[in-house]
Amino acid sequence: MSSDTDELLARLEADAAAEKGDDGGEPEASGSKPSREDQKPDTGGVINRYQAGVLSDRYLEMVLADWKNTGLLLMQAPLLAAMAVSVWGNVDRATPTLYFVMVLSMFWVGCMNACREIVKERELFLRERMFNLDVGAYLFSKIRVLSLVAIVQVGLYTVICAKWIDVRVPIGWLGLILLATAISGTCLGLLISSAVKRSDYAVAWVPLVIIPQIIFSEFTIDADQFQGISEWLFRLMPARWPFESLLEFGQTSTHYLTAVSYVLPALVYSVLFLAVAYPILRMQRY
């Protein structure tokens, strides 16, 4: 892992020097071909693909090396699924409350996975920013690895619930909807992590973004009872749309196009959360 970090820092220094015109080297002959080491890595347009690859590899190694914490994160899913089974395992068919609990559980899991992942390495991030670290590549590396974690968690949760509960939703669609929910929570967690300066602040913010998902939902009152600003907040809650999708799939006559369309806002929220986190990270300096 240290060799990857040293290599990345070396390339960042080279890029920074190249941009400032401080190379100080002799110009190459017109017919000579620059070596691979002298070529600037392809940025790939939106993000620096070289940095994204190195950062992803480094972050994945860190996640795997911290096997105790990773194991605890992965254990959340089967434990939450077991709780759901203990309540709905003997019920004839799934209820709207079950669907809401499933969505909220995966949103919580995704948010908790990510809420400390930037702030805990704030010093490293700020140091590498001095050497031209690409913020887009950095965020991409986080969501790439955390999405793999979410896939495992959602897979465990989905299989356990579908095995012992009559969810009335095809297992493939159930997994995709819950994965979109978990990734949306992950992106919100990364936004929180980019905006705070201490890990304990990040953890404290998680309930403050989860509880509104409960308050402004059909879990508390009927949708037609929300009025004024509460109605707008009800419509804006990220967890609402995957819940609506599960409700549609759970009906006897499912309108698949409608059910799938309800998942799209979760993906839009994921992009929105990252889009807000990006300038926040770009503005941070020592």
Please provide the spans of the model-predicted regions.
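ABC ATPase nucleotide-binding domains
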Residues: 1-30
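Generic hydrophobic, helix-prone segments enriched in Leu/Val/Ile
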Residues: 12-13, 52, 108
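Alpha-helical transmembrane segments of integral membrane proteins, especially early/N-terminal helices
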Residues: 28-39, 64-74
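Short, membrane-interfacial amphipathic segments enriched in basic
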Residues: 31-54, 229-239
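Cytosolic transmitter module of two-component histidine kinases
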Residues: 54-55, 61
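Membrane-spanning alpha-helical segments of multipass transporters and channels
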Residues: 61-286
